[in-house]
Amino acid sequence: MSGEPIWVTGATRSGKTTFLIEQFRRWMQSGGRGVGGVTRAANSPVVLQTERGSATASAARSIARPLATGGFAPGVLVLAAIGDNRIDLLDRLTTVTEGRVSLHSTTPLGFFQEEVMLFWSLLIQQLDLKAQFPVRLAPENEQELATQLWRSALDRAIGQQATIAEGRLVRRLLDLLQLASLAGIPVTDVPVILDQGLNGQVDALPLPDVEVGDLLQLWQQWCLERGLLTYGIIAGLYWQYLLPHPVYQEQLAQRYQLLLADDVDEYPAIARTLFETLLDAGANAVFTYNPDGAVRLGLGADPVYLSGLADRCRVETLINRPVPCLGDTLEDEIVALVTDPIFFATLPDAIQAIQTTSRAQLLNRTADIIIEAVQTQQIQPRDIAVIAPGVDAIARYSLSELLANHQIPVESLNDQRPLTSSPVIRALLTILTLVYPGLGRLVDRTAVAEMLVVLSREAEGKGQEAEGRRQEVEDSGQRTGDRGQGASPIDSYPSPLTPHPSLIDPVRAGLLADYCFVPHPDRPRLLPATTFPRWDRLGYQASEAYQAIVEWIETQQSQLEQRLIPNAVSLLDRAIQHFLFGGGSLPFEQVSALRQLIEAAQHYWEVDSRLRHRQRFDAPASMTVSRFIQLLQSGTVTANPYPVRPIGPASNAVLLTNVFQYRSSRRAHRWQFWLDAGSPRWLSGVDSLFAAPLFLQGWSGRAWTAADTMDANERRLRRILLDLLGRAGERIYLCHSDLATSGQEQTGVLLSLVNATIPLDAR
C-alpha cells in the first residue's frame, strides 16, 4: 500500500539508521510529497549495501502521502533513544538536508517534558491547578523532598523492617511511579500490581501495597500543587491528560507530519500511544527496531509492546550487515556455548583469552597487550574498547595510569563521578561553611587545609614571572637560605589539584589549619597567620596568600550581614571569579564540575524559592545552604568529567566502559577486551529498576519468581552477546582472572568461552 509507514528491523549494525536517513533524503527530494516506489512482496527481506544503486535505493518505497496542506512547511519529529545518539542522528540528517529543513530532535522523555511545559495551560484547566509556571525537579531534589514528605511512613517501615536503607526505599517508591507512568498505568493500579507480582515480599518493599499507592498519590498531588514536576509525573500527565485532549491532538497533527523514530526498542510503552495518535492523524513515519536490542529494558522501555506497531507498517527486514563483524560468523556458536556449557568446542583465533591468577595481574597484562599493539602499529587506540559488566575504581585507575604512562589516552565513557570527588568543589563548599553561620559541623581541619591549597592558585602571568625569577636565581648559583625571603623551592607548589602552582603547599596548609583554624558549631573562623608560633617559616608568598583568603572571607561575611549576597549561588560565583579566575584556565573536567555545581545550586535555590513562597515562612538562609552541602556530600549530584566528543589527541583514545553504557552508545571497535570474563555479573548484573518486569504490557499477572528472574537474565545475556559480537570487527579478548578483587574465585557464565580458547601466553 503506497504511503504506509515503514518498520525497519534488523540486527545490530545492519544499517537501520542509514535506511531511515535514505528514506528521509528521498522525501526531501520529492518536496515532501513522496517518491516512486517499487513493486515487492510485503515483509520480504532487504539486502542493504553501500554502493550507488544498492538495495537501499531499490527497496525503499516512497512515503507518498502529501505531508502538509496549506502554505507552511511540514514538521519533522526526530526521536532517538538517548541524547548522544540524538546528536549523531541529527548531524547526519542535517548533512542530508543541508540545513534546509527544520528538524525537531529529542528523546521520548525529552519530548514528553517539552509538551507538558508547552501545553501547561491545558493541564491547569483540566486539573484545576494553580496558574504558575512549572519547575522540573532534578532527581536529587526529588529524593530529598519525597523523603521529607514521607518521613513518618518511612520511619515506621524501617523501624519494623531494617533490612533496607532509607535512601534506597525512597528511590524504589519514586521508581515505581516512573515505571507506572511510562507504561501507561494509573497510579491507583500500582497496589494491585505489587500485590500480584511481589506476592508479599516484605524484604524488597517493607510497606503495605495500599500504603505505597497512597504515598505515590500524596507525592504526585503535593508536587502538582506547587508546580513541581518529575519525569514520572511528566509522563503520567502526558499520557493520561494531555495526549487524549482534543485541542492538543489537533495541534500535534498540525505540527508534525513526518516522524522518524530510531531504535524504538528502547522506548516506553506510552510512546506507542503517541505514535498511533500521529499515524491516525495522517502523519508518515519510519521506525527502526532491533529485536535483540532492548538495552533499556527494565528502565521503562517496553520493546515487545512497541513491536506491535509493525502491524500498521510495511516491514523492511535488513539481513546483511554493510560492515563485516564477528557476529556474522560466530554469534550462533558463542550463544550456544554459553547457554549449553556441556557442548565442547574450540573457538577460532578471533577469540583469544588472557588468563591470570589475580586481578592485578590481569589488569597489567591487559594493558601490556594494548600497549604492544599500539606501539607496533597493529591498531589505533580509538579502535580498542575495554568492556566490563561493571568498571570499578581500581580497574579505571589502573588501566588509565598504565596506558597514560605510554602516552595512550583513555576515554572513560559517561564516567559520572560525585561532584565532591573534585577538590575544587570541596574547596568551594568549605568557603560556604566559613561565610554562612551555623555550618561549623560541616567543616574540619582537613577540608580547610585542602581549601587553602586549591584557592591559593597563582595567576598565570604572575606564575610565569615567579618562575622567571626562580630561574634567574638558579642560573646565578644563588640559593635562598631564608624561607621568609624570596621564593623558596616549594613556595609555589605545583599541586596536582590545580594546573597552576599553589602559593600555599600542602605542608604549610596543614600547619595553618592546625594552628589558625578555630572550629565552632556556629562561627568557625580563620585566625591571622601570626597565630602560628613559627609563622616566619611560612614564607612571604604563603603568608600573603593566606591573609588574602582570610580577608576575602571576612568581606563576604560582612556583605552577608548587610544582605548584599542574595544567595549561595552568588557567593559561589564570586569565589570562582576571584580564586579560580572564572574557571577559564582550568582543565575540562574541573570546568565541567564547576558548571554542574552552579547548575545544581541554581536549580536547588529555584525550588527552595518556590517552596518558601508556597509555605509562607522565612527560614534562615544557612538552613538551605546546610541542606545543599549535605546533599552534595552524599554523592547524589554527579558530573561527567569528559566531553561528549573528545577533540584533538584525546579523540584517539582507548574506550573504557561498562556493558550497558557501551551498548547504549551504539559504538563499534575492531578489538574488544571483555574484562572480568569470569564475573557472575555478566548474567546477574543489575541494570533494571525495582519491580520493572511487573510494569511491562506483556506481564502475565502472575507472581514474579526466582525462575522468572533467571529466565530474564539469560535472555538479557543473549542480547548482550549478540550486540557485542555485532560491534566487534576483528578480535575479542576474554580477560579472566581466577580470583576477583575480593579474593573469591570467579566462575561466571562466560567461563565456558574462556575454556574454549587457547590462552594467549600459551600460543
Model segments located where?
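C-terminal accessory regions
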Residues: 676-756
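Conserved P-loop NTPase-based nucleic-acid remodeling module centered on helicase motor cores
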Residues: 72-181, 185
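ATPase/helicase motor core of nucleic-acid motors
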Residues: 378-384, 388-463, 484-558
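Conserved helicase core region in the C-terminal RecA-like lobe
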Residues: 82, 106-111, 259-265, 596-600, ...
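Accessory C-terminal helicase-associated subdomains
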Residues: 210, 521-658
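Conserved helicase NTPase motor core
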Residues: 13, 204-310, 317-322, 358-362, ...
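Helicase P-loop NTPase motor core
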Residues: 2, 9-24, 28-31, 39-41, ...
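Accessory N-terminal region flanking or inserted into the helicase ATPase core
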Residues: 5-8, 149-259, 338
